[in-house]
């Protein structure tokens, strides 16, 4: 009887199984979900790897991608707001330093001293690499046109001036045209600092025999050549020559140039050029107050007409 009951029970179960569809067990469900998740993970990973070859930012999570798309403008270089800023950006070294030479029609005439200035960069020791960082700052149209046809192209900038007649010709020392040219140059240099660019200003009648940058003092705001050097680079008793000046852009130098340019009108005799005014204000309490750090360059290395270097090996 036991065998019969067992057979009946088994037969009955088989019949039910044949009539009713079996439901998957919990273990089977987990296996299916695991396969689906694995397939999805592999597919997404392949897509990310493929896209990252063209855009590495695609490996970021969706919310980070969304944040980046909303803020991507902060990662783009800022477009220049003016023609001057465009020229500065194109000519600047990695540390935002430019070399500036002021030009007018007389300075850039064919076979002029300016041609020798450019040639000195080619033949000087370690100087040719700096030619691409030189900006010809022109005060009249003819100087600008000639600048564009020389090695400086495209780093030429035309100052917006309404008095070309006084600025473009041969201006003898201390004539009204000379003084106007000097102070127009000073205002331009102040503007360069305000835009955040360091500069090395060089008169166009200076010949670059060697790379001057190793001679500059580190961590100094303002460095200037001397007509007469007393042997102490920190002494304000040195008599300066503003035709070769290295300045780093910061709040101290911007304030100093504003003070320097504004001081032209502080004195009864306004027929003063920038060097005379500098020598009058260099001990002013305001200069100490802003904390600008100055150094005066040895004429052994940076020679001038008043005190030419006696060492041809080092000048």
Regions found by a protein language model. Give the residues of each.
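Active-site-proximal specificity loops/subdomain of glycosyltransferases
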Residues: 112, 137-195
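GT-A fold catalytic core of metal-dependent nucleotide-sugar glycosyltransferases
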Residues: 2, 180-254
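Acidic, Ser/Thr-rich intrinsically disordered and amphipathic helical segments
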Residues: 44, 83, 98, 112-116, ...
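Short amphipathic alpha-helices and their capping/turn residues within compact interaction modules
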Residues: 122, 126, 139, 152, ...
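Beta-strand elements of modular eukaryotic interaction domains
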Residues: 86-90, 125-126, 134-135, 190, ...
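Short coil/turn segments at secondary-structure boundaries
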Residues: 113-116, 135, 148-152, 159-162, ...
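Juxtamembrane luminal stem/stalk of type II transmembrane Golgi/ER carbohydrate-processing enzymes
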Residues: 1-114, 119, 126-132, 149-153, ...
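Catalytic core and acceptor-binding pocket of nucleotide-sugar-dependent glycosyltransferases
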Residues: 4, 43-47, 247-315
């Amino acid at each position: 009887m036991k065998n019969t009951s067992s057979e009946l029970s088994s037969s009955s179960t088989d019949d039910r199984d044949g009539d009713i569809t079996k439901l998957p067990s919990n273990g089977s469900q987990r296996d299916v979900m695991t396969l689906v998740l694995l397939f999805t993970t592999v597919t997404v990973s392949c897509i990310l790897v493929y896209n990252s070859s063209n855009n590495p930012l695609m490996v970021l999570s969706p919310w980070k991608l969304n944040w980046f798309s909303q803020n991507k403008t902060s990662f783009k270089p800022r477009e220049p707001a003016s023609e001057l800023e465009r020229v500065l950006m194109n000519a600047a070294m990695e540390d935002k330093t430019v070399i500036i030479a002021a030009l007018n029609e007389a300075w850039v005439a064919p076979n002029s001293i300016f041609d020798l200035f450019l040639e000195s960069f080619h033949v000087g020791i370690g100087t040719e690499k700096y030619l691409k960082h030189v900006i010809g700052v022109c005060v009249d149209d003819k100087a600008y046109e000639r600048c564009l046809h020389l090695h400086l192209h495209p780093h030429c900038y035309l100052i917006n001036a309404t008095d070309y007649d006084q600025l473009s010709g041969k201006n003898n020392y201390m004539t009204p045209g000379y003084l106007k040219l000097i102070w127009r140059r000073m205002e331009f240099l102040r503007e360069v600092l305000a835009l955040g660019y360091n500069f090395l200003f060089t008169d166009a009648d200076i010949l670059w025999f060697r790379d001057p940058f190793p001679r500059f003092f580190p961590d100094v705001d303002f460095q200037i050549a001397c007509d007469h050097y007393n042997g102490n680079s920190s002494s304000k008793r040195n008599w300066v020559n503003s035709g070769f000046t290295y300045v780093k852009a910061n709040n101290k130098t911007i304030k100093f140039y504003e003070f320097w340019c504004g001081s032209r009108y502080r004195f009864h005799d306004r027929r003063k050029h920038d060097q005379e005014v500098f020598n009058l204000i260099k001990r002013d309490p305001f200069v100490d107050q802003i904390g600008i750090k100055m150094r005066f360059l040895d004429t052994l290395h940076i020679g001038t007409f008043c005190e030419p270097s006696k060492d041809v090996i080092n000048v």
